[in-house]
């Protein structure tokens, strides 16, 4: 079968791979679609360590074509996800308290185990979440990581109906954060970016305000919008240091700043302000299986509509080049059905 494999020179090679036999508790999935995430770029570039030889992809959607022994959660024909959280131990303090994404023994698709940019992929049946049949599978691929990650982050922000939430970076993740915040949580949303095309798209999606941080002072604009109060919370999906710092600067006392993007950098934190204003800065890592079920359902109800563009597996290096240049709006999704 064809698979997108990480090479030593930080590129991706389309190679023929052969899967091992299924083990108890596993299922074999024929991949239909796989979204391309910024984390895939980090993995390819060895930012998290060298994983030469691994098959990329953790925004996969496909149909179960075979199940192993001891599998009763799935059946042949089910449409399921192949997500970043491939499997966890199920027994630790995190797994038993609803925080399974923090499991120290977690396996990650497309990083520590082979992922979904392949014609077929092996999944842990207990961690493959079923996809609603009325949800377009190509759109569902974007929800599998970008969607659940931003949905969880918006939940972590504690935002309430009518409050102001700032979303920093409105690309593949941020446009979904905007939709979950506005259409599910009932928040007022300010979109921050340095790309006018992405900001205009955010406005089309319903952003209450858009701010190009290179043209205006974000603090001044937020003060104007909120009568000098500041935002109630911010979510950062951008992958640069500056927006992380700005996201702290524009919030009010008692606000929560949720970090999602993964720039290889460090934040500059004004400690006296954090302490005196009681500002919380927290990280949010993807989402649990239950978060993913909820995120899928909101998409199936058309409350969240991912903007996607179908691409071919052979274009994967071009997609990464575009990603590094910051020219992508929405989500690139590999049409794996065209490779079968």
Curated annotation (Swiss-Prot):
Zn(2+) 1 binds at residues 37, 58, 145. Its cofactor is Zn(2+). Pfam families: ADH_N, ADH_zinc_N. One of its GO terms (molecular function) is zinc ion binding. Disulfide bonds: none annotated. InterPro entries: ADH-like_C, ADH-like_N, ADH_Zn_CS, D-isomer_DH_CS1, GroES-like_sf, NAD(P)-bd_dom_sf, PKS_ER. Binds 2 Zn(2+) ions per subunit. Signal peptide: none annotated. Zn(2+) 2 binds at residues 89, 92, 95, 103. Belongs to the zinc-containing alcohol dehydrogenase family. This is Alcohol dehydrogenase. It comes from Staphylococcus epidermidis (strain ATCC 12228 / FDA PCI 1200). The lineage of its organism: Bacteria, Bacillati, Bacillota, Bacilli, Bacillales.
């Amino acid at each position: 079968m064809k698979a997108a494999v990480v090479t030593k020179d930080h590129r991706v090679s389309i190679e023929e791979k052969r899967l091992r036999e299924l083990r108890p508790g596993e299922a074999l999935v024929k991949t239909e679609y796989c979204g391309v995430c910024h984390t895939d770029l980090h993995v390819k570039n060895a930012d998290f360590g060298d994983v030469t030889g691994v098959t990329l992809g953790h925004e996969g959607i496909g149909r179960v074509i075979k199940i192993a022994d001891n599998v009763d959660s799935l059946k042949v024909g089910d449409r399921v996800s192949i997500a970043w959280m491939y499997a966890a131990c199920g027994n630790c303090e995190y797994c038993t308290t609803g925080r399974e994404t923090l499991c120290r023994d977690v396996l990650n698709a497309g990083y520590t185990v082979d992922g979904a940019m392949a014609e077929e992929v092996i999944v842990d049946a207990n961690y493959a979440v079923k996809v609603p049949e009325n949800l377009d599978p190509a759109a569902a691929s974007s929800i599998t990581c970008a969607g659940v990650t931003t949905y969880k982050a918006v939940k972590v922000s504690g935002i309430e109906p009518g409050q102001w939430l700032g979303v920093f970076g409105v690309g593949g993740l941020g446009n979904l954060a905007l939709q979950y915040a506005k259409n599910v949580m009932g928040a007022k949303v300010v979109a921050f970016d340095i790309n006018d095309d992405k900001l205009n798209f955010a406005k089309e999606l319903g952003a209450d305000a858009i701010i190009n941080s290179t043209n205006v002072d974000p603090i001044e604009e937020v003060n104007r919008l909120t009568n000098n109060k500041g935002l109630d919370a911010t979510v950062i999906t951008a992958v640069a240091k500056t927006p992380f710092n700005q996201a702290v600067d524009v919030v009010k006392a008692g606000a929560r700043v949720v970090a999602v993007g993964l720039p290889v950098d460090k934040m500059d934190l004004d400690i006296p302000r954090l302490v005196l204003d009681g500002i919380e800065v927290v990280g949010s890592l993807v989402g649990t299986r239950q978060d993913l079920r909820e995120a899928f359902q909101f998409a199936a109800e058309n409350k969240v509509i991912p903007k996607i563009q179908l691409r071919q597996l052979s274009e994967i290096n071009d997609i990464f080049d575009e990603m590094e240049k910051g020219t992508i709006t929405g989500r690139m999704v590999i049409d794996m059905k065209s490779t079968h």
